[in-house]
Amino acid sequence: MPVGLTGHREGLHPLHTYTRDEARAVIEIANRWREKLLNERGTRFVFPSDEFYLQAGMALPEDEEYEDYGQIDDGVGLLRALETEFHAAWAELPESERRSDGAKRTFICACGVSAAAFLAELFARHPLTGIEMRVIPVKNRFFGESVTVSGLITGGDLTDRLRDEDGEAVFITECMLRSEGDRFLDDMTLDEARRIIARPLIPVGRRGDDLLCALRGYAQGLCP
């Protein structure tokens, strides 16, 4: 996993984030070891984090390459699992719910900068009847803009970004919230954020089928 550097490093040892070429080099080294270990021990053992692939501009490994997703709590394989789960749930919908034409209601998916392009492509490949998804990347001014993961977005940064954006409801990953489930890392509560952006703000579980269920549930009036 690439080192995470905040904007609060004054007086600390100098470090730098990975460049595109450096991230590619890490993946190439990891792939050699993964192939060797799979042949010798039956497991790939080495699993570069999603951030390495995003930084390198390379496709994520296929679902089976993550084996049992043993490091998903640290975000390793999280995007591949999300896509696999979302696609499986979407494919089970009736064709009438998977159309891209007709009138649409606009919903926002707010996320960290690193995941934005991936999510935009996910929604583009999985149309939902009557729903247009806008993916809004949120820059992290609280910890520093080099911090690009969704789980470290604060309520202040989120509301500043969304205040003037069009969309009748906002969906976020529950990973943005503290363990209590109702408060961001900067102590802003969900209710405070909802009042600022003046629309529903809906936390969603990290699974892809959780996301699809939340979108359909809100669109069909099954959740507030």
Task: Name each model feature, range by range.
Residues 1-224:
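Auxiliary Fe-S-binding modules of radical SAM enzymes
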